[in-house]
Amino acid sequence: MTLRIRTIARMTGIREATLRAWERRYGFPRPLRSEGNNYRVYSREEVEAVRRVARLIQEEGLSVSEAIAQVKTEPPREQPEAERLRERFWSSVGALEGDEVTRVLDDAQTVMDVEAYCDGFLLPLLREMGVRLDVAREHLASALIRQRLRQVYDALSPAPAGPRALLACPSGDHHEGGLLVLGIHLKRKGWRVTMLGADTPAAALQGACVQVRPDVVALSFVRARAPEEFASVLEDALRACAPFPVVVGGLGAREHLKAIFSLGAQYAESSEELVAIWNQVRNAQNRP
């Protein structure tokens, strides 16, 4: 199976422009040419190599060139447990075996800590299924993963004090997996989290802000939108959330950074970035 660069970007979280820059400078990843239309396509092995490079950069602090050099020179490895679990997941989803999918999710949770389970296992599966599954299988798989993320989220004890975050997907966004992962991270950092979930209209956001008075509102945009639609949805949300600071994230927001900043919101790709933005806002408010 081969995949286009846009698909690789969605699966790995690495932007298309970044992948093309790596290819020009380092010869990595290495594309093939599809028959008939001469498009650049990539093998599943290259996708896994890109993921390993990203992990080396993020987790071990290697530079891009160091990480790519290390991955290129890696000897063939035995298939790690996480990869075996992923293969079992896709196989059982393909067979529409919901009970077996549940067993795979149980097995993964047993051998992984919370961060590895949510960020390294469940969330990548959610991102990938949209480009490799038909509607029935995607519905089965995504429902089971969201259910599992919700269980992890609910199992975390609420903080008795600490900053408060209001989390929502805006109107029209029905995929809350990334939002749940953010909520898990914030709860583990001692935040009080109010989770509104998917497809939250502006009026509901406004009512929640009035009652909760959050320190920050986090909006997760997942689906692709035209620039005009994105700006309109965000403007409505910002009016509803005023005067509270709004941080935007999600795959559907990455292509609209100019609109996000020009409308007065902030952008974050992780809980760490969100917390850093909140600290900046708080420090600015406390200045004489």
From Swiss-Prot:
InterPro entries, per database record: Cobalamin-bd, Cobalamin-bd_sf, DNA-bd_dom_put_sf, MerR-type_HTH_dom, MerR_fam, Meth_synthase_dom
CDD domains with a match to the protein in the record: B12-binding_like (cd02065), HTH_MlrA-CarA (cd01104)
Family, as annotated: Belongs to the CarA/CarH B12-binding photoregulator family.
Assembly description: Forms homodimers or oligomers. Interacts with CarS.
Domain characteristics, as noted in the entry: The N-terminal region interacts with DNA and CarS, and the C-terminal region is involved in oligomerization and binding of cobalamin.
Keyword DNA-binding: yes
Regulation: Binds cobalamin (vitamin B12), but cobalamin is not required for CarA activity. Interaction with CarS prevents binding to DNA.
DNA-binding region: 5-24
Database matches in Gene3D superfamilies: 1.10.1660.10, Cobalamin-binding domain (3.40.50.280), Methionine synthase domain (1.10.1240.10)
Domain HTH merR-type: 2-73
Gene, per the UniProt record: carA
Keywords on record: Carotenoid biosynthesis, DNA-binding, Repressor, Transcription, Transcription regulation
Coiled coil: none
Consequences of knocking out this gene: Deletion causes light-independent expression from the carB promoter.
Domain B12-binding: start-end pairs: 162-288
Its biological purpose: Negative regulator of the carB operon in the dark. Binds specifically to the CarA operator, in the region around the carB promoter, which blocks access to the RNA polymerase.
SMART domains per the UniProt record, alphabetical: HTH_MERR
Protein known as: HTH-type transcriptional repressor CarA
Gene Ontology molecular function terms on file: cobalamin binding; DNA binding; DNA-binding transcription factor activity; metal ion binding
Example GO biological process: carotenoid biosynthetic process
